Amino acid sequence: MHECMIVFFIFAVVSIYYADAESCLYLGQHCNALATKKCCPPFTCKFVNQREGICVREDPGAESCLYLGQHCNALATKKCCPPFTCKFVNQREGICVREDPGVGGGCLPDKQQCRRNKDCCSKSCYRGNCRSK
C-alpha cells in the first residue's frame, strides 16, 4: 500500500511538471493578453492588437517602437520611434510620420506620442504623450 502511494505521488508530480511545461508557447505561436496563452521564456508576446499577439524573441534592453508608415495608437501600446510621431487619423489610431524639424525646433508638441522627457518641447513625457508642465 505504501509503495502504491509513492508511485502515485511521483506520477502526480511528473504530470504537474509536464502540464506546466506545455502551458506556455514558443516562437511564432499565438499568445494573448489574458495570459491563458503565454510565451515560454525567453520569448515575449508582441501584441498585434489589444488582445492577441505572437511569441517573439526580443532583446530585453531594446525598446519596442514603430517606424515611418507603421500604424500607432493612442494607448501608447504601439508608439513611434523618435524622430517619428503618431499622426492620428481618428481618436485612437494613427500613422508614424516624420515631423518637420523646423516646427518646434525638432521637439514634439503637446499630445504627441513620446518615449522620453527629452523628446517633448515641454520636456514632460507622461504616459506616452507630451504634456505641458
UniProtKB/Swiss-Prot annotation:
Main location: secreted
GO cellular component, one term: extracellular region
Cystine bridges: C107-C121, C114-C125, C120-C130
A UniProt-annotated Pfam family: Toxin_7
Signal peptide: 1-21
Keyword vocabulary terms for this entry: Disulfide bond, Knottin, Secreted, Signal
Record flagged with keyword Signal: yes
Subcellular localization, as worded in the UniProt entry: Secreted
Domain characteristics, as noted in the entry: The presence of a 'disulfide through disulfide knot' structurally defines this protein as a knottin.
Protein's UniProt name: Egg protein CP422
Organism: Schistosoma japonicum
Taxonomic classification: Eukaryota, Metazoa, Spiralia, Lophotrochozoa, Platyhelminthes
Gene for this chain: CP422
